[in-house]
Amino acid sequence: MGSQASKGGVAVEGKAAAADPAAVKTNGQENGHVKTNGDVSAKAEGDAATTNGSAEAAKESEAGAGDAIEPAPAAEGEAAKPEGEATKETPKKKKKKFSLKNSFKFKGISLKKSKKNAEVKEEAAAAAPATEEKPEENGAATEEKKEEEAKAEETPAAPVETPKAEEPAAKAEEPAAAKEEAAAPAVEATKQTEETNSTPAPSEQKE
């Protein structure tokens, strides 16, 4: 107010305000300032009584309070272009999909399967079932080998017995052959027991 006192028209305004106090109060202004005194309804109704363009600024601030992120209308065209460019870049990123089938490289380490590794794994996988089957075959094969060995030992003993010059040697071999023949029936007996064990029990056949 001190600055207004230096003006020449201040005294006239003061007299007009004193002469017509009712007009000043109905307008809600005193000396160019808005008096609210807790009366918010004047702002809500959109009273245009404010001066110096403060009403427009208030409306903009109220509108901006809802969306403070919105750019100014002049900048919308400029802002839309970078957004459009950003949307063009995002489909490029979406085209790259994560897949376990693709090879990965971490600082020079390649996790891609090579043909050699795949072949080794296939051979190992093929060897595993073969080794599982071999124990069954091995059991039968060992029995067959024992029988063949026993027969092979018996057959050479027979030709040795035929020459008459080697009768003393043949007599020494005969007890050995007799022992082998005795061992052969024992092998056959064990074979029969194993065969009976290898045949499934009736309860196992039902399953």
UniProtKB/Swiss-Prot annotation:
Membrane topology (UniProt): Lipid-anchor
One Gene Ontology CC term in the entry: cytoplasm
PANTHER family: MARCKS-RELATED PROTEIN 1-B (PTHR14353:SF13), MYRISTOYLATED ALANINE-RICH C-KINASE SUBSTRATE MARCKS (PTHR14353)
Summary of the tissues where the protein is detected: Strongly expressed in brain and eye. Also detected at lower levels in muscle.
Free-text disruption phenotype from the record: Morpholino knockdown of the protein results in reduced head and eye size, a ventrally curved body, and enlarged brain vesicles. In the craniofacial cartilage, the ceratobranchial arches are reduced. Formation of ceratohyal cartilage is disrupted with an abnormal angle relative to wild-type. Morphogenesis of the developing neural tube is abnormal, with a smaller angle between the walls of the hindbrain neuroepithelium at 24 hours post-fertilization (hpf) and in some cases a partial opening in the dorsal region. Some deformation of the midbrain walls is also found.
Predominant subcellular localization, coarse grouping: cytoplasm
Protein name: MARCKS-related protein 1-B
